[in-house]
């Protein structure tokens, strides 16, 4: 049976399929982990330790000796995305209550959901698209996008926008596994090769564990809003990214479009941040559902929009540009 190949036909399938399976299990039998205990409970409820190992491996995979062109391109996209998310957070904080919107079409929407969806780029999706529509340097620009992985950037945005306060050691704790992996990977290339191979392997496991924090009834309540959020992520972050890529990065804007997605790892951020700062617990469940929906929407739409943009503004023959399904959302 071609189970893996079938799953990979779905955009981000290696994370989203286990996530949906976990959500189904949590909705129909929420006490499964407690009932079985042991290793079964660990797989069901181990989101944080699994993500910690994944974050370590992400750090180990980054090569400090990347070329200047790659670093300029990558830095431009990463800083632009973070800056846009910060501006949006500042603006939304003026209108959205601390515990999120409770009624109407926007019920469940919170600043936590918006920032989590906007401040990270799907590095795997970006790299795949740039392999097809960009240059080698543009493809390699995903190197710094790994720095966005995990809750650190979201915490910094929420903190600097005055929406939350975190103790300094919480920031250190959020990034320490990444830094240790980064150091080891650059001290020994064999360790980099060894640990980087584990990055895609861990994705289904934290997807399943994360799914077990989601109740499908919440997703049903926020489904259409999640689609709207996904489209908003593409528009609100995509336009500044295109401009930054053309003006600062020296590209034609295609890389900016390809970087306008929501990262699969962002789905975990609301829950992790709520564990660090309990004031976010009331909105964590709905934020997780909204971010998951926006990840799916952007994973489907961004490849199509990137192909159309490259066809019109790129430096490649139009006949060679057809939207292709992209199989993963690694970062």
UniProtKB/Swiss-Prot annotation:
Transmembrane segments: 10-30, 42-62, 77-97, 100-120, 141-161, 163-183, 200-220, 224-244, 254-274, 289-309
Domain of life: Bacteria
Any one annotated GO CC term: plasma membrane
Localization of this protein: Cell inner membrane
Protein name: 2-keto-3-deoxygluconate permease
Keyword Cell membrane appears in the UniProt entry: yes
Function noted in UniProt: Catalyzes the proton-dependent uptake of 2-keto-3-deoxygluconate (KDG) into the cell.
